[in-house]
């Protein structure tokens, strides 16, 4: 039946069909977590962009949680730790339980576990991070980081509600090479939330970041106020594979505006000086913020002092010699491994992602919906990602070769 086609044409068909096939497409699934983020990335410039996410400013309603996240939660063995109650900024547990004991291990009581990132190894390594972005002052901070060639040396723990209301600022950080991580959706005391609410706070922030960053799934999160215990740790790790990042020193830059009677730019800088210009050699993982002009001013004043005193600045992942994202190695242009909507593996070419955000109307070969009826697809890794399911590639190659062989025989 192929006799009317020329040998050259059939040979070309074989080459074309075989060309997209790469061994990397046949690798095992990178992580079960990648299956939890299946929606095609909406266009942040589209008028309906916000409709793809829960409302900013409050914990997402449980009804918005994709069923896949809840199913994963059901498989996680959680410790017997009660939900805490907020009490003047300090979570308390029922029956006067001690939040510092090993079973609860609340960082509010300065308890941390081996898996937490607390203080980086190595001498004079400053693990640079900023919480609470993006804000109005974030673009100026990102400009300063770029001017000093340290954009990729900073981790930004971002708030989900801020991400979706200021996506262009996030894209600036991505394009500059900043390392993005999770700071929850609405900045609550996490130990006071139910298991499902914890999932919503983390998962939706991860989704928003992944959508903007080419499908790169965050690997790190920092609890607001440092409020984390073993129950919350277990959910973050068990459901989403997240690593909990704490701090070994609080700069109190946040308090300049919150507690002006106790803290000022000068007093915070004076404390900062003791850390970066003194005799300390142990690595630093500081609590810093991109909240307002005061917090940015403190950093811009102290950074040159630290460098002059021999400190090397690295983002959190690099400071601990770990990869940047759950499904990608180092940088915002490394290869991304994700799951397609059909549950098959695709590998994207390295690309800067700020110019390749997928359309909100992108189509897919199958449909998966969350509990709120929202269509979910894989987080788009790049517009250059192949749209053919990997399961079809070997068979297409065999078919093409068969056609060529048939032509020869004819």
Swiss-Prot record:
What general EC class does the enzyme of this chain belong to?
hydrolase
Q: Where is the active site?
A: 131, 289
Q: Which CDD domains match?
A: CE4_MrCDA_like
Domain (NodB homology) spans: 124-314
Residues carrying a glycan: 61, 80, 149, 279, 293
Q: Where does acetate bind?
A: 131, 225
**Signal peptide as annotated in the record:** 1-18
- Membrane topology qualifier: Lipid-anchor; GPI-anchor
Names of the cofactor(s): Co(2+)
InterPro entries (alphabetical): Glyco_hydro/deAcase_b/a-brl (IPR011330), NODB_dom (IPR002509), Polysacc_deacetylase_ArnD (IPR050248)
* Protein's name according to its UniProt entry: Chitin deacetylase 3
Organism for this UniProt entry: Cryptococcus neoformans var. neoformans serotype D (strain B-3501A)
Gene expressing this chain: CDA3
């Amino acid at each position: 039946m192929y006799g009317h086609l020329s040998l050259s044409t059939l040979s070309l068909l074989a080459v074309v069909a075989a060309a997209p096939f790469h061994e990397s497409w046949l690798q095992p699934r990178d992580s079960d977590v990648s299956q939890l983020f299946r929606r095609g990335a909406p266009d942040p410039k589209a008028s309906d962009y916000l409709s793809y996410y829960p409302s900013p400013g409050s914990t997402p309603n449980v009804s918005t949680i994709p069923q896949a996240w809840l199913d994963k939660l059901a498989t996680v063995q959680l410790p017997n730790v009660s939900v805490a109650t907020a009490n003047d900024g300090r979570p308390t547990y029922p029956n006067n339980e001690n939040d510092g004991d090993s079973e609860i291990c609340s960082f509010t009581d300065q308890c941390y576990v081996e898996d937490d990132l607390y203080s980086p190894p190595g001498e004079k390594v400053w693990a640079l991070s900023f919480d609470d972005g993006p804000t109005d002052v974030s673009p100026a901070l990102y400009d300063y980081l770029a001017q000093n060639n340290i954009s990729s040396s900073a981790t930004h723990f971002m708030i989900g509600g801020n991400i979706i209301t200021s996506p262009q600022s996030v894209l600036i950080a991505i394009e500059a090479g900043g390392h993005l991580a999770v700071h929850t959706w609405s900045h609550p005391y996490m130990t006071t939330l139910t298991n499902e609410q914890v999932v919503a706070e983390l998962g939706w922030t991860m989704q928003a970041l992944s959508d903007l960053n080419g499908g790169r799934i965050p690997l790190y999160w920092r609890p607001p106020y440092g409020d984390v215990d073993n129950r919350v740790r277990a959910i973050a790790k068990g459901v989403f594979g997240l690593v909990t990042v704490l701090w070994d020193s609080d700069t109190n830059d946040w308090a300049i505006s919150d507690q002006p009677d106790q803290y000022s730019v000068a007093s915070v800088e004076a404390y900062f000086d003791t850390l970066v210009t003194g005799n300390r050699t142990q690595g630093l993982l500081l609590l810093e913020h991109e909240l307002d002009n005061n917090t940015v001013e403190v950093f811009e004043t102290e950074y040159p002092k630290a460098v002059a005193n021999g400190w090397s600045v690295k983002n959190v992942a690099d400071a601990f010699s770990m990869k940047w994202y759950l499904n990608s190695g180092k940088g915002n242009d490394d290869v991304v491994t994700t799951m397609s909507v059909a549950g098959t593996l695709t590998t994207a070419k390295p690309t800067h992602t700020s110019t390749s955000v997928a359309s909100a109307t992108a189509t897919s070969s199958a449909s998966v919906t969350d509990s709120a009826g929202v269509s979910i697809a894989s987080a788009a890794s790049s517009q250059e990602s192949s749209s053919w399911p990997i399961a079809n590639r070997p068979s297409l190659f065999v078919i093409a070769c068969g056609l060529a062989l048939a032509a020869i025989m004819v």
